[in-house]
Curated annotation (Swiss-Prot):
NCBIfam families referenced in this protein's UniProt entry, alphabetically: Q_tRNA_tgt, tgt_general
Keywords: Glycosyltransferase, Metal-binding, Queuosine biosynthesis, Transferase, tRNA processing, Zinc
Annotated positions binding substrate: D93, S94, G95, G96, F97, D147, Q190, G219
Identification of the protein by name: Queuine tRNA-ribosyltransferase
Protein EC: 2.4.2.29
Domain of life: Bacteria
Residues the record marks as active site: D93 (proton acceptor), D269 (nucleophile)
Recorded family membership: Belongs to the queuine tRNA-ribosyltransferase family.
GO cellular component: a single term: cytoplasm
Pathway: tRNA modification; tRNA-queuosine biosynthesis
Job description of the protein: Catalyzes the base-exchange of a guanine (G) residue with the queuine precursor 7-aminomethyl-7-deazaguanine (PreQ1) at position 34 (anticodon wobble position) in tRNAs with GU(N) anticodons (tRNA-Asp, -Asn, -His and -Tyr). Catalysis occurs through a double-displacement mechanism. The nucleophile active site attacks the C1' of nucleotide 34 to detach the guanine base from the RNA, forming a covalent enzyme-RNA intermediate. The proton acceptor active site deprotonates the incoming PreQ1, allowing a nucleophilic attack on the C1' of the ribose to form the product.
Residues the entry annotates as binding Zn(2+): C307, C309, C312, H338
Subunit structure: Homodimer. Within each dimer, one monomer is responsible for RNA recognition and catalysis, while the other monomer binds to the replacement base PreQ1.
Length: 373
């Protein structure tokens, strides 16, 4: 079976890879950071701005779009690309992470997850089949398995049956997938911070490999120590199929991103850059900058003196601080624009470094300055 999403490695430097993912809506150069458009919009950003900052792919959220405005409505309106006027690739998550984050509002059963809406308390049920059906309706280029997401520091006793359920659910997702010719399905490797359990999860999913266009690493950056995340990435990523893209879910901190790339990760996403931006925190080459701070009240410098984004070319720290302090929408837009640009550019620079066989030096130099060491 020819898969609708393919990957080609162009260059390697150690384990780090520069490549190209091909989808029906275009190509994606990797490594890549993917802005998150939870409710069919990347918060505060227009399509034109997303293209301007170099976005090649964005995320949509299955859980949120199922609740509002509803996946069937989006399908009737021509699918998610048409609905949000975005003609480049889209990845949809399965809704699993959001449903499992509901805590007491959800009940896990073998058939799926029963939950109450965080909006109005209405009762809902998402199964592996339902998750795939929603994603088929949305019409994204990359769809994700519906997996069980164990909490950050879960015990082995909790994780073993959880992995086995994820494998059973994976089989059901594969069978339910109605658009295998146009939507690439990604597997999700779980296993917490235990190397042997990560291996178990990957081994079980690999038995269905011909159905998967890529492999995601789930269940990291959920509260475990950083060292554990790096150790697991270092162990499991290179064991994923070489000829398919590898996606680290939910990571958007610059240092973590570069360490992930070093382990062989190709794709990452996170709400962090826009969430931090809305609270007045921005990324710079010298680390995070809290723009609300009094010290920037009369600062005429740009957010990052070495950044060539539209915001840094046109606005001062003092002005952006003022906007954030008085809660003007433009402030949120400018900080969001800059943060997303920063992470997308970081991955483009990492790609160049890999192609020029200087990634390790690039990474160490960036981290040393970013962490002020």
């Amino acid at each position: 079976m020819k898969l609708p999403v393919t990957y080609k490695v162009e260059d390697k430097d150690g384990k780090a890879r520069a490549g190209v993912i091909t989808t029906l809506h275009g190509e994606i150069e990797t490594p890549v950071f993917m802005p998150v458009g939870t409710q069919a919009t990347v918060k505060t950003m227009s399509k034109e701005e997303l293209l301007d900052i170099g976005s090649e792919i964005i995320l949509g959220n299955t859980y949120h779009l199922y609740l509002r405005p509803n996946d069937e409505l989006i399908a009737r309106l021509g699918g998610l690309h048409k609905f949000m006027n975005w003609d480049r690739p889209i990845l949809t998550d399965s809704g699993g992470f959001q449903v499992f984050s509901l805590g007491s509002l959800r009940k896990i059963k073998e058939e799926g997850v029963y939950f109450s809406s965080h909006i109005d308390g209405s009762k809902h049920f998402i199964s592996p089949e339902k998750s795939i059906q929603i994603q088929n309706n949305l019409g994204s280029d990359i769809v994700m398995l519906f997996d069980e997401c164990p909490p950050g520091l879960s015990t082995r006793e909790y994780i073993i049956p959880s992995i086995e359920r994820t494998t059973r659910w994976a089989k059901r997702c594969v069978e339910a997938h109605q658009k295998k010719d146009i939507q690439g399905l990604f597997a999700i490797v779980q296993g917490g911070i235990y190397e042997d359990l990560r291996q178990k999860s990957l081994d079980e999913l690999s038995e269905m490999d011909e159905n998967f266009s890529g492999y995601a690493i789930g269940g990291l950056a959920v509260g475990e120590p950083r060292e554990d995340m790096y150790r697991i990435l270092d162990y499991i990523v290179e064991k994923c199929p070489e000829e398919k893209p590898r996606y680290l879910m939910g990571v958007g901190e610059p240092v973590d991103m570069l360490n992930a790339v070093e382990s062989g990760i190709d794709m990452m996403d996170c709400v962090q850059p826009t969430r931090l931006a809305r609270h007045g925190t921005v990324f710079t080459k010298d680390g995070r900058l809290v723009i609300k701070s009094e010290r920037y009240k009369e600062d005429t410098k740009p957010l990052d003196e070495e950044c060539d984004c539209y915001v840094c070319k046109n606005y001062s720290r003092a002005y952006i601080r003022h906007l954030i302090k008085v809660q003007e929408v433009l402030g949120l837009r400018l900080t969001s624009y800059h943060n997303l640009y920063f992470l997308i550019k970081l991955m483009k620079d990492a790609r160049e470094a890999i192609k020029e066989k200087r990634f390790k030096e690039f990474k160490e130099k960036f981290i040393q300055r970013y962490e002020g060491k």
